[in-house]
């Protein structure tokens, strides 16, 4: 792992740890801060080594063998070879909402996950375009920081829920005055926004890069553009109802429509802009669509 990625990962983990500790302090004072810091250290360790398993479990994703999904394995193996990385494991998510994501610490232990809905919606070329995009995240070593962010942001949301319950049902006396209540309200409002901004910071530019890298790996920018349009349209009418919004940045298209309240705070670039960039890449490759 390059120095730049180590620095980005360290900054991310430090910031999220500080956010967790701050929320802990607002909930339980010094004792809450100590507990939150202990949880943060534990979560950092667990998320580094087991974050891929955690994310897969959130979506009941199942690792499938070549015998179970021969065509899918063939596509993943071919594109991984063209990208110059080891073949990732292959997982299928049991939902008809079309989407895909990659997870893992690095190319040596990565997983590419696709939903059942994606396999039903896309043709072969479009599926290759999507998988090439996910392979690119692995090749560009985005998966570690994306997965860490998902797990730690998920922990933040759990503490925010706890803070909300503490605010509603907690008993406050003169020693814990209105300042504590105001602090809890600020935590409830601002912590999710901070988590979203972190996702935004690590996601948007990397999505453009994965689009470009994937298009060049597969040689089919037009197929990826078509896939993005189909996925976007399907999610508009059938968003993912169950799942953790903290993982939104991991998917090729945000599956949680309605979570982002403005393009400014979207975890993904607008699909139209991604397609326009793919058109330019296609022209460079001598492809018109």
UniProtKB/Swiss-Prot annotation:
Its main location: membrane. GO terms for biological process: proteolysis. It is an enzyme of class 3 (hydrolase). This is Protease HtpX homolog. It holds the Pfam family Peptidase_M48. It comes from Pyrococcus abyssi (strain GE5 / Orsay). Coiled coil: none annotated. Belongs to the peptidase M48B family. InterPro entries: HtpX_protease, Pept_M48_protease_HtpX, Peptidase_M48. The active site is at 134.
